[in-house]
């Protein structure tokens, strides 16, 4: 690791091409494997230490520089017999190594900001947990919103060119380009029917995609800041990036130079908000739909003219938040009125006023969750619980533990829901599916099995909060009901574990 730290220090002295030698360091690939950066082929091969060889990696890299090199497809089912090793394993190893190396410049910027030696130029370091307080605080005051699917380039060359600005190392990026073209089927990696966040995509492609998103968001951020405070100190990043894209012959002058004053006018509304999560974003505004339309067409033109990414404006709907719901991070989010009556008395006169307030409402999408449970055989398509036959051979403790873990994860994640009736239905399906699985294992009926165990089995499905409150308030059922209605955002949960992982 001392040698690794030595190479990192080169970036602090503004030396270029310092990443390229790291490609030929064996500890880079060991680091990528040991930390489990991507649960893929590397973690599924038990004999990794015996099969891996830096010599083979160097030979693969050398082949990419040969003019008449042997192109190996990742989907080739009949590899040459003289290779003598798992080509998919080593292609995956190189991909993981590239991901570690290319992330170094981004990590150094973050470390420098934490040490106080440099101010981070990127403003995309906010946690996903800040989204939920933002929605509760800001959304009730907004009127219109759009759920936008962020398009991603259909060709990896666009992603590599975008990365050139952030990682100024031509040698490494040239080798990365050769690797992507030679060892991957570009038509099958990124298609409109396959999300960039699919688990089959390596970490490297997530890094390339995030650099593309960071690039276009930095342009949006610049324009938004310039509308409120025109400061030269923050504009040098933007003009440096314009010069960079002029070098690679992008039509920047067509997008920015001609319409720059008009673009700044688009962003003058202080109530325009932008939220990104995974591959989607939300645009929301308090103003009329006219401003939302301007934002929509500006984003489409930015993607098409600046990044050569096709996007259809007709698929971006502008909805009134009080009448439509947004599918957001597994929730159905909307704004609903909360009516209250206030009685005021002044001397002998009394007044009754209707006070209407907007409230951010989050619901559990019951139909998609039942579909997910039916897909992994916890229930049928109608939501009727069935036994999990593949778990019937496990011990009783393992069966109960698996069901309890899934149930508590879902309860933990959807604790932010304003109405938990749908969540109770999901928990009921899991509980009864667990009982049917145990009854199937012991060759008994559900009724007989429940009589033998009593209520102890169902108590396992209570969350920690429910158990604590049941001990503190054993008879105060109103307290428990009030607790169930409260909305709690847990900061240690940002995604639902895929139910397939529990197989």
From Swiss-Prot:
One of its GO terms (molecular function) is RNA binding. One of its GO terms (cellular component) is chloroplast. GO terms for biological process: mRNA processing; RNA splicing; tRNA processing. Keywords: Chloroplast, mRNA processing, Plastid, RNA-binding, tRNA processing. Disulfide bonds: none annotated. Pfam families: Intron_maturas2 (PF01348), MatK_N (PF01824). Signal peptide: none annotated. It is found in: Plastid, Chloroplast. Belongs to the intron maturase 2 family. MatK subfamily. Usually encoded in the trnK tRNA gene intron. Probably assists in splicing its own and other chloroplast group II introns. This is Maturase K.
